[in-house]
Amino acid sequence: PKPSSAASDVYKRQIMCKGMNRSLANVIFGAVGSETSSAGSTQQEMNIKSYSTTEAAMILDAAEKIIIVPGYGLAVAQAQHVAREVADTLEAQGKKVLYAIHPVAGRMPGHMNVLLAEANVSYDVLKDLDEINPEFEDCDVALILGANDVVNPAARHDESSPIYGMPILNVDKSRTVIINKRSMNPGFAGVQNELFGYDNSIMVFGDAKDMLNDLLKEIKEL
């Protein structure tokens, strides 16, 4: 039976706690209590760069190694099939394409694996957190599709953040990070993501499925 949203949320937090070595109560109530101090002023300070799908396609065209990072936004948009089409098209152009799978991306453990299996993505290119993190060091483009907390660098260094200590995907180590989100709203943990304002990050706003369909057309035309 499919777990309820509330049950899977608690299970997800338990997994987060394991990685963070913190109590469940600390994470649940810590996120609520810290939201204003961690997220309140950050957005004003961040230098958000909004790009079009045409510009994103040009960046991907120049790349040789691309890592796709699926998240909850991909699931909501049911964009897994077009994500695979984009990956297949890039691979046909001679590029190396991998998928970075965080254990708690989405709304339940294994959510991304299930979605990508539905789209017949080869298991060989699905890499878990420990396996993929060293790959970001020489990655030309990390393409973030609706993932948020699991790519927030604050988890590594900001002790005031409710997600501090949570293992994350080190996408910020890539040369360029293309982030697709519907809006600037915070993720599951309720904190703003400092990655969005990094010098090597660009935002492509919109529904993941619509954005990827546009991106696919642009890539094919280049």
Language-model-detected regions and their locations in the chain:
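Single conserved hydrophobic/aromatic residue that forms the stacking wall/gate
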Residues: 1-7, 11
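Alpha-helical transmembrane segments of polytopic integral membrane proteins
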Residues: 13-17
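Conformationally flexible catalytic loops at phosphate/diphosphate-handling active centers
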Residues: 20-48
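Structured cytosolic domains appended to multi-pass membrane proteins
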Residues: 44-222
